[in-house]
Amino acid sequence: MTLRIVSGRSGTGKSVFIHQEIVEQLKSDPLGHPIFIIVPDQMSYSTEYELTNRHGLQGLIRAQVMTFKRLAWLVLQETGGIARKEVNGYGYRMLIRKLLEEQKSEFSLFRQAAGKRGFTEEIETLLKEFSRYSVNSSVLAEVKESLKAIDAPNTLQAKTNDLYVVLQALEERLGTTYVDSEGYYPILTEQLKYAETMKQATIYIDGFTAFTVRELELVRELLKVTKHVTVVLPFDHIDEAFDEQALFHEAALTNQRLHDIANEEGIDVEPPLHFYYTQRFQSEDLQHVEANFANMVPHTKKTSGDVMVFEASNRRAEVHAIAREITKLTREYGYRYQDIVLLYRQAELYDPLITSIFQQYEIPIFTNTKKTMLHHPLIELSRSALEIMTSNWKYEPVFRSVKTDLFFPLQAELTIWRERADRLENYCLAQGIYGERWFEEPRWFYKKYRGLEFHSRVQTDEERAMQAEIEAIRDEIRQPLKSLQDKLSIASTGKDIATALFELVESLQVYEKLQAMKDRELERGDALAASEHEQAWNEWINVLDQFVYMFGEQEMSVEEAAKILDEGFDTLEFSRIPPTLDEVMVATVDLARLSNIKVAFVLGMNDGVYPTRMEYEGLLSDTEREWFSQIGYELAPTSSNRLLQENFLFYRAASTPSNKLYLTYPTADEEGKALLSSLYIKKFIGNDKIAGLLSGVQAERVVMDPIELLDESALPYLRHPRTALAHLMVQLRQAEHSRELAPEWLALQKFYQQDPYWALIFDRVHYPITHKNEAEPLETYITQELYGQKLTSSVSRIEKYFRCPFSHFTTYGLRLEERAEYRLETFAMGDLFHEALKWITEETHRLQLSWIRLTKQQIKQLARQAVEQIVPVFSHQILLSSARYRYIQRKLIRIVERTMMALTQHANVSHFKPIAIEASFGPGQHEQLPPLEIDLTSGKKMFMRGRIDRIDSATIDDRSYLRIVDYKSSARDLDLNEVYYGLSLQVLTYLDVAMENSTYWLPGETEPAGVLYVHVHNPMLKLDKDMTDSEIEEDRLKQYKMKGLLSENAESILSMDEQLEESSGHSKIIPVYMKKDGTPSESQSRIVPVNDMKRLQHFVRRKHQEAGNGILSGDTAISPYKLKSKTACDYCQFAAVCQFDPSDGKQNYRQLMQAKPNEIVDKIRKEIE
């Protein structure tokens, strides 16, 4: 029973010495008494590798590499103390989640936080810390009393009490039946003296700088029981134990504690074995850095070039620079990948970059960062299936489960079934399928949505076929989930719930499907991905086992079980087999324990990262930990103590390699925000005021794109053809615009063009640079296939063509459309308003009610009845689907009511009366009016169809006048510039149709009176507190003033607003200002001469003709217009299709010139005449 301390700075050969000593013992007596080498988890594989591969051993029999937990298993197997069932990480997390729910009423501080996501993990972390430092519920009870006696803060007392409640409940639940991962330590400490194997054992402990209280108790017991204990510690002087600022303070303090234990237990302490001279370093620079790192005023040495610093423009440029340097080291200097390590923090930022960028350079890597299993299909299926049950079949969890592919038949062609599932998803999104709607058969009646015409149109054969497909894939999903729902509805215990979930997975043949996935990955040569499916299955089974262990006989709801299982699934991670190939090691600075490394890259050397900024102190703050320390209870170090350890962690990283050290840092993050370099960078290279460890080291600036550099400086960026190709493309694009290609880049281009493998890739990547983003005209036979022999069009289609021919092609040729969703769209509200006003007009006609004489009460009743009549057949009953939409329904009724009141007031002062409502025109049999026929070239015709909201007429001096009134759910006016360029043709087309078919309603000759817009809305008014009710109504009426364009005819204008006969000035209802002489003001009114109104009609026909000819000629030009600040791309849904880029000098908007209204009328007059 002896203790020996082996000490020394990094690289002095401590581990090498004990390995050689162990090897000598094994060679001299292979079957002698056991030797145990105890190391941290992350060192176990590398230590075994060192002992066998580097010392010529064929295997280990007498010696075993152990972690403390593996030692516990070994001892307890011998002594019989292993009878307890182990609660592993996910079982422990699930148990804590359950206890937090159960004890919520007992909490004084944690009550609100207990159910929040993440809090379980916080509690788990602290309870494990308590376990490591021997703080059980009895100790915590003493802590409570002590804190109360010294009048500690109330918050700390309340927190301690809540922690006591949780810890006591945890201990009661574990009892003598279960043990958690930390619970082995006290059992091992208790059982160690009964293990015969240990009594003659020799123990080596390596890789630790400090021990927790539990570990120290175990080391104490090892000293008492075993024959010999050697502990390897990295420190220089024993006096460093008394200096918190010392580099090796923690390890020296551990040395002091071990000596104290030996003295207390009467253990012999051998003379310390201290190593003074470094053996690791093949570089004078690195040897100098190690020796002088701790010095406040370091001795400066001229660099020999083995320490380099990269200053990168961002993290991506930083990782690219490292990949290039590794490529250089392996190609030109003979290093192997396994000689190189990347050390970093901020794994969440660097892992995706390292993985993707190193793939581009074909550099194999091994990372010890574990990947979560949360996104594996089996885990996602389990979580989403339970969420479906607890969320009433909401859309999101249903289709998360569907996208796992596990509902599809075992031998299914995945591409086909995924497309079917996508169509089902689109249907459910459009129809608002959730909850009981999954089981309401009428909901699954498929027709392509046609607004309010949905119920009146007959289902086509194509729609029937689509319905059959949707129902088939629906049943594949619905039936297993319904079976799960039925089983869970009668489940009462945790075991019942786990069994129901298992049976769902079993019924879907998930195990067989995972095996098929594994086989496909192996066929692709991805052994790592293949292993993940087997790991996921095994871990999923373990989670269910742990759940049943803990809660099998307990009564619980599905909601509660889902939350507990979710905590378990949240802890699952994929493990990776240690590297056996030649791979670059990627490891975190804090956990890495590495040997035989020649080159190290330390990434992300920024301020706040090295040393780390201690922003979060945990569930117990530093101040609260100090209260614990004050009353004699040790816990894990405070953040300030951890900060003191930062120097040692970086020292260990910097002294890891034997040959070369690279320190790299970005100067900006992904958003361009500036980042400062770490103070350790200054320590190495110094600055203007302070000398660094090494002189002559300059931070090498690396950028993402070498175009920022001189041509010679760009050459190092061309280390791999795959990444160099991207840089060449940037150069070629620049050469297109501004400069010739430099000889270096021309040579690179020649390489790609001549290499058999890269030539095809080069041509494919180079194509977008030389190719103009132009759409070629369609051939005649294609236009006929797309648009048919007989072209039928709407005004909105023609307007889309004039906005951008390619946009027209995507909508009407390719028939692209956005995915429909179950929500109230703006255009749908417009349909509702139109239908409501139509219904009111027809209802007043049926009841023989005059709009002029309608009372407010009648208007309110008619508005309510109109909307209520429409709602059941409107947009799949969306206004009945939720309380929010029912509120919107009431708002819509109010809008119709307000608009009706305004329209009745308009009617009171107007001679114009409606003669047609919702007048449809087109080639169909059910249309009220014939189509507007447009003659095209080659003898073809285009037939225009549409629906006119309202046609009004008035008879003045035996002459009839017609006007168009169009209802809009947003404010609108007629811009003659937009008319001229074909962007706004609707109301003038409607006027043309009405004039052409005027004899349907009116005898004799008819004149155009104008076109007007009514804004259907409920206006917000700015009220004065002194305003009367009549003034408020008058102000509201102003908000309904119609906009548009009228014929310059005083008689027809006065007939629209009789009040203008009594007084001059602005009309309250039409866009006219009447002068005192009884004529309208041209400058303050929206009017044109009658003949010009007729010319506008003819001009609009010409625009239709121009568009029709363009469409049939196959025009698909990517030519979006720009008029003032408006462009065709503003609300275009298909920008990703055309890839129009106005920043590219080759692509430009079709610029339309703005002109005054009278200038536009003059231009039209000239063109028509």
Swiss-Prot record:
E.C. code: 3.1.-.-
Residue sites binding ATP per the record: 8-15
Top-level EC class as recorded in UniProt: hydrolase
GO MF annotations, alphabetized: 4 iron, 4 sulfur cluster binding; 5'-3' exonuclease activity; ATP binding; double-stranded DNA binding; helicase activity; metal ion binding
Cofactor(s), by name: Mg(2+); [4Fe-4S] cluster
Co-factor binding details: Binds 1 [4Fe-4S] cluster.
GO biological process, one term: double-strand break repair via homologous recombination
Keyword list, A-Z: 4Fe-4S, ATP-binding, DNA damage, DNA repair, DNA-binding, Exonuclease, Helicase, Hydrolase, Iron, Iron-sulfur, Metal-binding, Nuclease, Nucleotide-binding
Keyword hit for Nuclease: yes
Ranges of residues in domain UvrD-like helicase ATP-binding: 1-296
Limits of the UvrD-like helicase C-terminal domain: 276-582
Annotated residues for binding of [4Fe-4S] cluster: 804, 1129, 1132, 1138
Record note on quaternary structure: Heterodimer of AddA and AddB.
Recorded family membership: Belongs to the helicase family. AddB/RexB type 1 subfamily.
PANTHER family with a match to the protein in the record: RECBCD ENZYME SUBUNIT RECC
Described purpose of this protein according to its UniProt entry: The heterodimer acts as both an ATP-dependent DNA helicase and an ATP-dependent, dual-direction single-stranded exonuclease. Recognizes the chi site generating a DNA molecule suitable for the initiation of homologous recombination. The AddB subunit has 5' -> 3' nuclease activity but not helicase activity.
Misc. remarks from the entry: Despite having conserved helicase domains, this subunit does not have helicase activity.
UniProt protein name: ATP-dependent helicase/deoxyribonuclease subunit B
